[in-house]
Every structure is written in structure tokens, then in C-alpha cells.
């Protein structure tokens, strides 16, 4: 009798769908065997980047490309005046592969090149699919592949780095908008100017957006053209490697925001009609074009596509020493309708035949491969449908991600701020939303990410304070709206952080309430960089209130990080009284008490808590966080015995709770 998969054992409600779950699991097992071949492994299979593309050999150069629909292929570039010449014609071999070998002296480091691909009825210039370096001409704006063979390639100093994940505290960032200046930041500037800030703040991982080359800067890196090339607008491959190496030396893991859910439509720069056909890498029917993203959808049922994408995962892990990936657009991959306009209200919605089983197989194999290449690697899914098993082990019947993004939380905060008066904020609803997750899957909590900061949306601080940010952020300027916004910003972030069961993520600048929105240069804004940067000077200034939020974030991150395995300790609710708007919960020896009431401060407020002594750790009302110092931090609180609760080891913890404040206490028996 076949053994029941663990995800079904752990959730009896999945039993009616066991055939579908087992079928998906079996599909992945079968496909892995097929790809690995007799005596091989998935790790062996994922070596396309070592065969295709341009490689230096002992005798010269070798170049290969998969282009089954092509009738002729030429290598063109600065070395042959960009013309088709017989000596640079590729030869077709088995499997639709084209190859050429060249003498050593034909190509040099820095040379630019492309392919000229011919097919029945047409031809076009193409950037090689496996190009590891593409650059854009500043005058013509044309992209080309570039030979990258420096005389002294970068050598990593930190070997065998192991990420700290107990808990995982992620700083989401974008290299280009990482500087104060109105322009594009570089890998080197980020390494020198931003990494030290992240280290000081206490985050133990960074998640870098927009690494894979993309023609349009304003796409935020999500319309990828060259999947193996680190974006050259930020610097060289060696400078990115140095950044990652430096992060590792500081104990900071580096996660890459990887895009395997779709590709840019561009044909000259990207994979669209690479060999003249419509279905080489992508679906050839109505599924080819994404209905919402103006991009192309991969055909995950093709082994050549799996070869390309799986090898891509391995390439970034080995070549650049990334510590894992946050997979973008997973919902779009999982469903034929990309999850668009669909409400996921029951388990039926996950097993009704509307799922792309080929994509599920790919994601399962990708997770298995990544963890084989690096057992300490981190994988995170950006997925909003709530697909069960997404962050369960493959061996348990899951898809194999380590974490899933808790995407309902930022939506909850936006809805609460927009639609509810302060006096209607309910602690019961807040606690339920923050802890409503599958017991056997780890999540990444967050109050907001880059999505909420984009033009057309608003960050939490901007929703709370709005235009008063422009006029009333001086330390000596007392404005009720600003005070309210700062108080709630602190509470929202701490309650979201304190309830994690896996990790937490913050987008750069949001920790100190960076004003306004993100808007990359485009025709509609006059190609301005004004809103595509981070104004670090705001948090550095002693006369501005941003410093209060920055200091609070630093201290709560260090607090959670100081508690090993904080994310694994049970979240024990002690008190949630909607009438008073008070919430209290315990994790290990820390007790978090929130008073969301906008107008009432409570003296000697009683909370039922384990009997013992409670000492102050921090509170949001301290003046270093922009508060009023209404709480005496020197007082130790002994619980008051109550005959009704004493048999259970519980007593009354009496506290002073200022309005719109949170305090953290340490419990001692």
C-alpha cells in the first residue's frame, strides 16, 4: 500500500484531493528521472550554462546556441565589423544546436557580439540566450553581449557561508535606487554606502531586486531579457561578486529576486522569437502572452525550457554565491488563468484542473535542485492564492519552498488604514490576520514591500501622515497627525515582526518612513530620477523625526535577533479586548503589549499572564523613538495572585498603557 504523504497526514481536509496531490508528486519524480537519465542526477542535468554560450577553451573559444528553427546562424561583433562572414558561421549539430570554435586571438575581453539568426522567411539580430554579460550603448541605447574574461577574475574570500535563519530578517533592496543622488546607483556604491547601514540595523539577509538584465529600467527588473547576465547598468560581474562577498563577511545572506514566471517580449534583446519561431521557449498558442503583464509565458512542459531555467538557478548559486532565491510571480505560474480575477475560497480551487502541472513540476524540481547544490540555500515563494504544500518539503508531498510570502498581511494593513477609523481597529482581527497560516509552512511576514511603495500606491507612513510629511517632520514641530502616524507606524511594524513563524522582510527606506513613492524614469515624469532613489540624509539628520523610526526599527530587529529561534517559539495570546483595543501575547520570555486605543491611556491595566516578575525591555513611547516617556522603565512588575487563576499558574499583570503604544517586557518565573 502506498504511504500517505505527510502534507495529507498533517491536514485531513486534503484527503479528498489525495489523487491530485499524489499525481503532482509522482509527476515531479518521473520528470526528475527522465531529465537525470540513467546513472545521472538533477544536478548533473542543470549544466546547460557550461555547454551553451561562449566559453574559453585551451585552444581558443567555443560557442553554442539552441535554435532549432534557424536555417543559418552567424557570430557578429566588434571583431568582424558586425558583418556576416563565412568564418563566423555556426554549424548545425544534433538537437537543433548550433556551434562554432574560434582561435584564441579572435576574441578579447570587452569585445561586443551578437548572433545573426536566419529562418525561413526572415532573419534578425539576437543576443545569445546564455550570455553572461550584456551592455547598452549610451548613445544608440542598443544592447549587445560582451566577452567577459578579465585577466584577474574576482576570487571570493568567504567560503561556505551559512545564512542565519533563526529568525530570517530580510532587507529588500534595489541597487539602482540605493543612493541619495538622482541617478542610477552601482554595486560598488551599494557595497560601500548601504551594506554598513543594513548591518547596523541588524538584518541578516538582503533580497536584491532587478539583478537579471532587463532592457527597461522602469520595469523594476521584472521584464527580464538576459537570464544569465547580471544587470550591467549597476556595474560589472566582479563588482557584484565583491558586494556579495562583503555581505557574507558581515554575516548577511544574499537572496536574489529571480524571475522565471515570464520574460520580456523584446525579440532583439530577449528570447521572443529567438530562432524565428513563436514556441521555442514559450507556449505557441493563446497562452503565449501574459494577459496582464505584456510579457511571454514559458512552456514548462518542454525539457529544453527546464534545462534553461534549472541551469539558471544553479548558475547564480555557483557563479555569484547567491544564498537562494525569492521566486517572483509564482501564482501566475501555478494557474492557467494566472490567478487573475479569481477568489481562492476553498480547497477545490487548488485541485480543479485549472493548475499548470508542468509549472508545478518545474518549481518542485527547482527547489530540489537548489537545495542539492547548496543545502543551506533559501527559497521563498511570492504566491497569493494560498496553494497548500507550497512551502512543504518535496519528500512530504510539497513543492519544496522554505518560505512563502504572507501576502495577506500588507493587504490587511492597507485596508485597515484606508477603511477603518482608529477607534475601530480590533486586536482580535489583527492577531488573527497575523497568525492565520498553515501550521506546517513557514511564512515571511511583512507590513509592506516594494509593491506598496510603487507610484499609484502608498507606503504605510504616507497613508498615515500624507502631505504633513512635507511640512511637519522637524523634531520641534508638534503635529497631531504626524504624531499619530509615527505611533501607528511603530506599532504596525512591531506587531507584524513579533508574530513571525519564519521570517520578516522590509523594503529599504521603509524602516525610517521614507516619504513619497517609487517612480522610475519614464516619459510621463520627464525621465526623472527624483522618486527612484533613497534619501538616507533624512534619517541621518538629527533635526528630523525620521531618526525616531529608524532607531525603533534597529532596536526591534536586534531584539528579535537576540532571541535564537524566536520564530519557532509559540505565539501565546494572553489578552485581546476589542472594547479597550488592547492586545498582549507571549513568545518565550518576552511579552508584547499593544494599546491601539487612539485616545485612552490605561493605568493599572490588568492582563492575565504567567505568574512571575516582568521587567522592561523597550517601549514605543520612549523619547528616543519619538515618544513622551510616560512609562517608568525602572519599575519591575510582579503579578498579583488571583485564587481563580492561581491553580493554572496565572496572575494579574498590572501595567500603565499609554494610548497608541507598545511595550515589551521580559518574564522571569
Residue ranges and their predicted role:
Residues 135, 143, 321-323, 341-532, ...:
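Conserved alpha/beta catalytic core and glycan-binding cleft of carbohydrate-active enzymes
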Residues 135, 153, 157-165, 170, ...:
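Substrate-binding/active-site clefts of carbohydrate-active enzymes
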Residues 65, 115, 173, 198, ...:
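Conserved, mostly hydrophobic/aromatic
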Residues 109-113, 590, 634-669:
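C-terminal beta-strand-rich structural cap/linker in extracellular carbohydrate-active enzymes
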Residues 1-62, 83-84, 89-172, 177-182, ...:
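The feature marks proteins involved in alpha-glucan
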Residues 178, 350-355, 476-485, 537-547, ...:
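Active-site rim elements
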